[in-house]
């Protein structure tokens, strides 16, 4: 649920009620119990507008428990942690992960951001794809090493 609310605040996600309803059901199954979650958990897939309203209620109900970041930078770092964990767990394509972390979540005006190396990796990967026929295992391993290093260090 925390990730769903972080994504929602980042880009108005989820666009469909499906993700919100699934997250509510998972939270309820995990023992979280709020009136907003119960309402959200019984919505049909087509009730997108209602899901957005209920997500706002759930966010208010769970705010003290979830400790959501209050700044854009804090939110982006939290989302980067999720994204990098997904990469390391094999749930996210290396190029998609590098693009999300290096461009969407890395601040453009911070040359010292711990997320900036992902942008550099993506440039090299795109160059390799264009001239070398695809990503090599070594380059993907380098990205995974970088993700593990950043998760253990600046994003820990």
Kindly label every feature range from the protein language model.
Residues 1-156:
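Acidic, Ser/Pro/Thr-rich low-complexity regulatory regions
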């Amino acid at each position: 649920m925390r990730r769903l609310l972080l994504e929602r605040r980042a880009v108005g996600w989820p666009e469909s009620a499906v993700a919100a309803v699934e997250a509510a059901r998972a939270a309820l199954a995990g023992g979280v119990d709020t009136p907003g979650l119960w309402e959200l958990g019984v919505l049909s897939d087509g009730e997108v507008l209602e899901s957005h309203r209920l997500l706002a209620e759930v966010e208010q109900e769970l705010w003290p428990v979830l400790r959501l970041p209050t700044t854009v930078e804090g939110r982006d770092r939290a989302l980067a942690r999720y994204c990098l964990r997904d990469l390391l767990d094999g749930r996210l394509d290396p190029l998609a992960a590098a693009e999300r972390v290096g461009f969407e979540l890395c601040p453009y005006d911070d040359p010292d951001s711990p997320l900036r190396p992902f942008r550099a990796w993506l440039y090299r990967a795109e160059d390799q794809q264009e001239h070398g026929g695809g990503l090599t295992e070594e380059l993907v391993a380098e990205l995974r090493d970088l993700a593990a290093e950043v998760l253990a260090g600046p994003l820990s």
